[in-house]
Amino acid sequence: MAKRIFLFILTNLLVITTIGIVLTIITSVTGVGSYIQNGRIDLMALLVFSLVVGFVGSFISLGMSRWMAKTMMGVRVLNPKKQSLSYEEQQLVDRVHRLSRAAGMTKMPEVGIYHSPEVNAFATGPSKRRSLVAVSSGLLQQMDDAAVEGVLAHEVAHITNGDMVTMTLLQGIVNTFVVFLSRIAAWVASRFVKEDLAPVVHFIAMIVFQIIFSILGSLVVFAYSRHREFHADRGGADLAGKDKMIHALRTLKSYTGHVNEEDQTAVQTLKINGKKHSSLFSTHPDLDERIRRLEAK
């Protein structure tokens, strides 16, 4: 569980930490924009600093999302204009594009396959016009056509719902609180040591508290991730039909054990299939609950 949490928050944490350290060094050297003056903390200056670091960090992560997913998951993008595709690959591209057009998209998402025995798929990208839908080789091997259709419709719904942008805004708010609170906590900690040790203690405490608050903040992100899955299920049902969407979820349930727990879970929130049992740290709600809600639709 600790590894899953760590991998999920790693990219975002590294970005905001790097930006925060760079800005802290700049303000320390130049004195411009410093939120600590004469040993006292300027809360308004710190809030502005936190907003800049928090939202810049989250939008950098958003901009990198498609490239990062391709790199970390080893996604092979299928482009009929530049390469010869097999019948199965061409059929996958055609299905994604057909569902995308049905959803009102004018710019078709990239379509890719990543090699993994897990039965899974994900969608990502900074915008509807720069999106990616990728499926695992295990999904194509194990699922029938109706189930694949339901999964792809679910992923297209994520794109048209703008889930990545909404997630970025939420992450920006979480980041702001993480940066703000971690620096206040670090400042308080530095007050309990000798003056010559205060800068070192402040820096170390800032990093430690930032990690702790990031883990706590991830609970909010995970909760939203679970919430958005229900919306994507409904959107998938509208595109592919309720029966296909329910069939896809039931098929996923039978292959839940094939989810790769050692995979690069920094993209775990993007996937359709999560762990079998839901918890506070789950990115996906329980599959039985997802099926129940669709059946009641």
Swiss-Prot record:
Main location: membrane
EC number: 3.4.24.-
InterPro entries given in the database record: HtpX_protease, Pept_M48_protease_HtpX, Peptidase_M48
GO biological process: proteolysis
NCBIfam families: PRK05457.1
UniProt protein name: Protease HtpX homolog
Active-site annotation: 155
GO molecular function term, any single one: zinc ion binding
Database matches in PANTHER family: PROTEASE HTPX
Gene name, Swiss-Prot/TrEMBL: htpX
Membrane-related topology note: Multi-pass membrane protein
Iron found in the keyword field: no
Assigned protein family: Belongs to the peptidase M48B family.
